[in-house]
Amino acid sequence: MNNIIEYIESKYTPIAIIVYGSYCDGTNNESSDFDALVISDNHVKFHDLSFVDGVQLDLFIYPKEFFDKPDDFSDFMHIYYSDVVKDTNNYGENLKRNIVKYVDSLPNKTDVELLEGIAWCQKMLKRSKQNDIEGMFRWHWLLTESLSIFCQLKHKQYFGPKLQ
């Protein structure tokens, strides 16, 4: 991981590096990529998919200004479980704290909304039985969306398949 951090530091001059995913929770293996949010003073928004030492990067680079007045952290919920590995003036820790606060403040679904989610799953299951491309599409959509609906039924946020 040290070579990856050195690469990030030399290329983006980050003020914060926030690592999430398998390299954060210690479950990384030979097929893992390296997930990180990188905040930079001097770089535009960019998605870096380079390789370092055979590890594919999945770096989301953002200029600091992007987070100056955020009103919605929904695209950054995956940072909830993360490690700030480089930080200047507590910028990364403050950003993570704001994201955690945002996620923790999200309301649970109402009983009506939960029932709607179940009904949607039942409808998709029925429609997925079509023996055509639309049926296959609906089957895969059901498989992915039902994970989120299941977590909603348990009054939890869905952060991905590894974080439950």
Pin down the residues of each PLM region.
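Conserved nucleotidyltransferase catalytic core and NTase-mimicking acidic/glycine-rich helix/loop elements
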Residues: 109-164
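Conserved NTP/Mg2+-binding pocket subregion across the NTase superfamily
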Residues: 48-133
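Proteins with a high burden of low-complexity, intrinsically disordered sequence enriched in S/T/G/P/A and R
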Residues: 1-3, 49, 71-73, 84-92, ...
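Metal-dependent nucleotidyltransferase catalytic core
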Residues: 1-31, 37-85
